[in-house]
Regions:
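Extended hydrophobic/aromatic segments used for targeting, binding, or gating
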Residues: 30-42, 50, 54-60, 64-67, ...
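Membrane-lumen/periplasm interface segments of multi-pass, membrane-embedded glycan/lipid transferases
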Residues: 1-23, 121-142
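Membrane-embedded, lumen/periplasm-facing catalytic core of multi-pass transferases
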Residues: 57, 90-142
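Membrane-interface catalytic loops of GT-C/OST-like multi-pass glycosylation enzymes that act
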Residues: 1-5, 46-64, 108-114
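Transmembrane helix-loop junctions and nearby membrane-interface residues
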Residues: 19, 23, 47-50, 81, ...
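Signature aromatic-anchored transmembrane alpha helix within multi-pass, membrane-resident enzymes
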Residues: 28-40, 80-107
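Hydrophobic, aromatic-rich transmembrane alpha-helices
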Residues: 6-29, 70-77, 89-96
């Protein structure tokens, strides 16, 4: 949870749905296949990094280059949401959750200090998997 793409940008869950939606036209279908392949290849490549978590950072640092791809795949979802109120509400809730997480990282020092407190992340990378202490909730603790 400490570096997960979908933990830090929950609205990108809908991008996965957008990857499955069939775009109109043969060229768009080919483009979709290429873009999905780029995202998948990127994911596989960074998985082989020794410090796949990106060191002292906030969020999925190595996935930041993929943001335009995930936003592209939100386009058909947003288009479909105009006629499906439940999808529009889900989009709004996931977007709000995404903003909340990034607000914590941008405005709360405790979220960034998570990398070194209580122990340096690079010495104890097992902390990345601790659901009881995600960095974006650190500032909410008493």
């Amino acid at each position: 949870p400490a570096r997960g793409l979908l933990t830090f940008v929950p609205v990108f869950l809908l991008s996965i749905y957008g990857m499955l939606l069939a775009p109109p036209g043969a060229q768009a279908k080919r483009l979709r296949g290429y873009l999905v392949a780029v995202v998948a290849l990127h994911w596989v490549l960074i998985s082989f990094y020794e410090d796949w978590w990106g060191g002292h950072s906030f969020g999925p640092r190595y996935f930041s280059d993929m943001t335009p791809y995930f936003v592209y795949f939100l386009i058909p979802v947003v288009a479909r949401a105009r006629t499906r109120p439940a999808l529009l509400v889900l989009f709004g809730l996931l977007t709000a959750a995404s903003f909340f997480v990034h607000y914590q990282g941008a405005m709360r020092w405790a979220s960034y200090a998570w990398n070194v407190e209580p122990v340096d992340l690079n010495r104890a990378p097992s902390r990345l998997w601790d659901w009881k202490d995600p960095p974006f909730l650190r500032s909410l603790r008493p």
